[in-house]
UniProtKB/Swiss-Prot annotation:
One of the protein's GO biological processes: protein refolding
Binding, Zn(2+) 1: C151, C154, C204, C207
A Gene Ontology cellular-component term: cytoplasm
Residue span(s) of domain J: 5-70
UniProt remark on domains: The J domain is necessary and sufficient to stimulate DnaK ATPase activity. Zinc center 1 plays an important role in the autonomous, DnaK-independent chaperone activity of DnaJ. Zinc center 2 is essential for interaction with DnaK and for DnaJ activity.
Similarity comment: Belongs to the DnaJ family.
Functional summary from the UniProt entry: Participates actively in the response to hyperosmotic and heat shock by preventing the aggregation of stress-denatured proteins and by disaggregating proteins, also in an autonomous, DnaK-independent fashion. Unfolded proteins bind initially to DnaJ; upon interaction with the DnaJ-bound protein, DnaK hydrolyzes its bound ATP, resulting in the formation of a stable complex. GrpE releases ADP from DnaK; ATP binding to DnaK triggers the release of the substrate protein, thus completing the reaction cycle.
Cofactor(s), names only, from the UniProt record: Zn(2+)
Gene that produces this protein: dnaJ
Description of how the protein assembles with itself and partners: Homodimer.
The protein, known as: Chaperone protein DnaJ
Keyword presence, Repeat: yes
Length: 378
């Protein structure tokens, strides 16, 4: 049976780049992998076909020969470039699944074949509590973070001074071993050296063979103005160190904003509850309110009711990605006086009597409410 065109097998154009070819291979290899399709001969054949196409098109020399001469250019029986056979499934997935699943398939998150596996260090998380004012204006601070550093006794080798790590006898320094089971040959992380390619016969007593010890380091952290609760700041390279020369992880500083005694934040806007005397609500006047930038005042019209909201533009918080500050919403609460003197009581009674003489025009909300109640019972 004639072989299908390699580009057709992978579903890519003839001018496809290396990244596009690799992406297509990943997708198809995962789809037809025998582990996902047990006892499925068609899937097995598709998998072999996809693997062969990728082996040819991912190699610059073979691809050039194939583009010029077709299958004859890469068929060893035709004197061309020659295929290298299929080998085990581990070869097909050593790079692909290693990129997708990290250590789960082949042991290494990064790194090439034939040597100790290289691992990126783990990320660290640090929770930090700040005030609303600090979140609004931003500030620089220092944090103390527990972290791993190279052991000073063994200089990071993990071996007792005077000794040194030795090549792992199980994997012979490769960091991986092949496990054969029937039709499959699977590459796994070496169980003795855990992918390092070496083992330590006499561990350092200070670091117990890890080559690193824990200590607290001080880091500078810049809190940007406008940061919100739950946001994270990334400090690149300040996570745990990598293994076998792998890159370090990152530190993520998670921000939590303390509850404020006056303001509640809603995005870039602020809200506050403002009690005002009933006389100010009735007669109107100027009231003063706090803001994060100081004090501000605004007029309250006469006849203001409790629960009325006033909007002060630009008195909120300037967001991280905005040059315009949010607004401050002031919710006024009309305060009823308490602990009245006899004279004050008499004055209020006279005032109440004068309101009754004026009819419903002094209390429009009360009239509206009583009218609704009356219609409800009718």
């Amino acid at each position: 049976m004639a072989k299908r065109d390699y580009y057709e097998v992978l579903g890519v154009a003839k001018n496809a780049g290396d990244d596009e070819i690799k992406k297509a291979y990943r997708k198809l290899a995962m789809k037809y992998h025998p582990d996902r399709n047990p006892d499925n001969k068609d899937a097995e054949e598709h998998f072999k076909e996809v693997k062969e196409a990728y082996e040819m098109l991912s190699d610059g020399q073979k691809r050039a020969a194939y583009d010029q001469y077709g299958h004859a250019g890469v068929d060893p029986n035709m004197g061309g470039a020659g295929a290298q056979g299929f080998g085990g499934f581990a070869d097909a997935f050593g790079d692909i699944f290693g990129d997708i699943f990290g250590q789960a398939a082949g042991g290494a998150a990064r790194g090439g074949r034939g040597g100790p596996q290289v691992y990126r260090g783990a990320d660290l998380r640090y929770s930090m509590e700040i005030t609303l004012e600090q979140a609004a204006h931003g500030y620089d601070t220092q944090i103390r973070v527990p972290s791993w550093v190279s052991c000073e006794v063994c200089h990071g080798s993990g071996a007792k001074p005077g000794t040194k790590p030795e090549t792992c006898p199980t994997c012979h320094g490769q960091g991986t071993v092949r496990m054969s089971q029937g039709f499959f040959s699977i590459q796994q992380t070496c169980p003795k050296c855990h992918g390092t390619g070496t083992y330590i016969p006499e561990p350092c007593v200070h670091c117990h063979g890890s080559g690193k010890v824990k200590e607290t380091k001080t880091l500078e952290v810049k809190i940007p103005a406008g940061i919100d609760d739950g946001m994270r700041i990334r400090s690149a390279g300040n996570g745990e160190p990598g293994i076998n020369g792998g890159p370090p992880g990152d530190l993520y500083v998670e921000i939590h904003i303390k509850p404020h005694s006056v303001f509640e934040r809603d995005g870039d806007d602020l809200h506050c509850q403002m009690p005002i005397p009933f006389t100010t609500a009735a007669l109107g006047g100027e009231i003063e309110v706090p803001t994060l930038a100081g004090r501000a005042s605004f007029p309250v019209p006469e006849g203001t009711q409790s629960g009325k909201t006033f909007r002060l533009r630009g008195k909120g918080i300037k967001g991280l990605r905005s040059s315009i500050a949010g607004d401050l919403y002031v919710h006024v609460q009309v305060e009823t006086p308490v602990k009245l003197t006899d004279n004050q009581r008499d004055l209020l009674k006279q005032f109440e009597k004068s309101l009754a003489e004026g009819g419903a025009r002094h209390s429009p909300q009360s009239k509206s409410w009583f009218d609704r109640v009356k219609s409800f019972f009718e």
